[in-house]
């Protein structure tokens, strides 16, 4: 009797287990079919990121926009709102090389001019202002205006980079040669400023020498 009861319990458990498996399979199939039907009725739309175009500012448009073409040269507006000729990358690099060569020549002239500074220098006591060893260097600075030496004066790089002659470009009073006149005017303004600064420096040096002479005279009287 006991064995029959055990066998019947096992059979009932197996039947229950099989029924549960069947229910799970049916529920899974139903859910899959519902998902497929829903996807067929409502297709999923792909979301693409918005294509944001970079808008050029008016300043950029003004730089790249050609103003006019004169004598084979296309003129554009620079960042500083000056009319300048448009050059290719190779032309710009060539003119940059010329400007670098100009700078190298100026510096080599400066070095050659002052390379013997130790021999012609004066020894000055910074506390008292007294010239301990007088080699005439300070006196020559006041007597000679060294800034007028054009070999050691660097000119504007604008002409070196652009390098278009006035004859090739047309009349100097032409609208499209304002960059050349502006550069010449700026150079003259710089020269005028340099002259005023040189006059101020000379006055300061003269005042310092007067003070120094007064100190020396006092010391001589004391001694």
Curated annotation (Swiss-Prot):
Q: Which residue windows does the record flag with biased composition (Basic and acidic residues)?
A: 23-40
Record's Gene Ontology CC terms? Answer: condensed chromosome, centromeric region; cytoplasm; nucleus
GO MF entries: CENP-A containing nucleosome binding; histone binding
> GO biological process annotations for this chain's record?
chromosome segregation; G2/M transition of mitotic cell cycle; kinetochore assembly; negative regulation of ubiquitin-dependent protein catabolic process; protein localization to chromosome, centromeric region
Q: Where in the cell is it found?
A: Nucleus
Basic residues bias locations? 1-14
Q: What is its main location?
A: nucleus
Region (Disordered) residue ranges read: 1-48, 168-202
Q: For bias kind Acidic residues, which ranges apply?
A: 184-200
- Alphabetic keyword roster: Nucleus
Specify the domain of life of the species encoding this protein. Answer: Eukaryota
InterPro entries linked: Scm3/HJURP
Its job: Centromeric protein that plays a central role in the incorporation and maintenance of histone H3-like variant CENPA at centromeres.
How does the annotation summarize its subunit structure?
Answer: Interacts with YTA7.
Q: What else is known?
A: Present with 556 molecules/cell in log phase SD medium.
Q: What is this protein called?
A: Protein SCM3
Source species of the chain: Saccharomyces cerevisiae (strain ATCC 204508 / S288c)
């Amino acid at each position: 009797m006991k064995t029959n009861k055990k066998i019947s319990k096992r059979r009932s458990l197996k039947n229950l287990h099989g029924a549960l498996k069947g229910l799970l399979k049916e529920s899974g199939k139903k859910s899959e079919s519902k998902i497929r039907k829903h996807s067929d009725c409502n297709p999923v739309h792909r979301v693409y990121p918005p294509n944001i175009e970079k808008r050029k500012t008016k300043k950029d448009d003004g730089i790249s926009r050609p103003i006019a073409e004169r004598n084979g040269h296309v003129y554009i507006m620079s960042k500083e709102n000056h009319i300048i000729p448009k050059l290719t990358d190779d032309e710009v690099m060539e003119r940059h090389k010329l400007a670098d060569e100009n700078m190298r020549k100026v510096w080599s002239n400066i070095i050659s001019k002052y390379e013997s500074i130790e021999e012609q220098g004066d020894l000055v006591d910074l506390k008292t202002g007294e010239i301990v060893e007088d080699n005439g260097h300070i006196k020559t600075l006041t007597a000679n205006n060294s800034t007028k030496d054009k070999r050691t004066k660097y000119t504007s790089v604008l002409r070196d980079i652009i390098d278009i002659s006035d004859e090739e470009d047309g009349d100097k009073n032409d609208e499209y040669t304002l960059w050349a006149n502006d550069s010449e005017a700026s150079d003259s303004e710089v020269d005028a400023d340099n002259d005023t600064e040189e006059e101020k420096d000379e006055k300061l040096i003269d005042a310092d020498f007067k003070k120094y002479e007064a100190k020396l005279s006092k010391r001589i009287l004391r001694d």
